[in-house]
């Protein structure tokens, strides 16, 4: 189901049924500031979404080939798996945190005796991603109006993205939403909860103020997003 969050920003609710659901976001830069930044998809859902991601895009009036780029918050199957459903129509670059690119490309082997490391080792073998133009991002890098913030913990290369014109922070799995507030994810889904909590505190102190908190799981907060992030940071 597609939901408009504000001018030029849409939520794409992807996956199957809870808890196998995740959020992706579509941002039309030209609708925000009149500039030709094109169409950006933030995360892509699972390899099998119901409804399919192409149908979600169609609900906003776009096709996969209209997407100019994909920004990935982190390498987990419920955030990158939908790339298989976008290809071959989508042929733009896919941006991901430098450390997570090493994970998915095999440049770094996840720790074998760690619950999430073992999961990522299995993911690389069981769910192959399409041959796309992967491009690494680091703290402070900018792409089409988005600024990347390195927020490790859930994954080593987890990124959050800030878009000033949209007054929106795309937070991935740094935080989840529960009962209208932000919370940290389940420990079993993260590499290092200590680093994750540090990332929450660090992001709350260095990201500019924003209205919309757009996370990977839960209902986006449409107002007071940065206040909600600071409230969480004060509690972890």
Language-model segments: residues:
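Residue-level marker for buried hydrophobic side chains located in beta-strands
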Residues: 40-42, 71, 94, 168-170, ...
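Conserved beta-strand hairpin/beta-sheet module of binuclear metal-dependent hydrolase folds
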Residues: 2-59, 160-177
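Short hydrophobic/aromatic-enriched beta-strand-loop microsegments
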Residues: 67, 91-98, 115-117, 170-172
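Active-site metal-binding motif and surrounding structural segment of the metallo-beta-lactamase
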Residues: 50-96
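Haloarchaeal acidic low-complexity proteome signature biased toward cell-envelope/secretome components but also
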Residues: 1-14, 34-36, 50, 70, ...
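Core dinuclear metal-dependent hydrolase active-site scaffold
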Residues: 26, 34, 138-163
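Metallo-beta-lactamase
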Residues: 46-48, 99-150, 156-231
């Amino acid at each position: 189901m597609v939901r408009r969050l504000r001018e030029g920003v849409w939520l794409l609710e992807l996956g199957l049924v809870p808890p196998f659901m995740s959020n992706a976001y579509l941002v039309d830069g030209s609708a925000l500031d009149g500039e030709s930044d094109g169409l950006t998809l933030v995360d892509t859902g699972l390899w099998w979404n119901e409804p399919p991601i192409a149908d979600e895009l169609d609900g906003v009036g776009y096709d996969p080939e209209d997407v100019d780029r994909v920004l990935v918050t982190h390498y987990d199957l419920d955030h990158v798996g939908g790339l298989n459903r976008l290809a071959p129509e989508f042929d733009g670059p896919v941006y991901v945190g430098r450390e997570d690119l090493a994970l998915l490309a095999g440049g770094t082997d996840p720790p074998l005796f760690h619950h999430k490391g073992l999961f990522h080792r299995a993911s690389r073998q069981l769910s192959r991603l399409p041959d796309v133009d992967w491009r690494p991002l680091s703290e402070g890098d900018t792409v089409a109006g988005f600024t990347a913030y390195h927020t490790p913990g859930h994954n080593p290369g987890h990124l959050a993205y800030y878009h000033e014109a949209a007054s929106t922070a795309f937070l991935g799995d740094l935080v989840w939403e529960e009962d209208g507030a932000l919370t940290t994810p389940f420990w079993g889904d993260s590499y290092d909860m200590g680093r994750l909590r540090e990332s929450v505190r660090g992001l709350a102190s260095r990201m500019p103020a924003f209205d919309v908190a757009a996370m990977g799981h839960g209902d986006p907060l449409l107002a007071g997003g940065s206040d909600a992030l600071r409230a969480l940071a004060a509690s972890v």
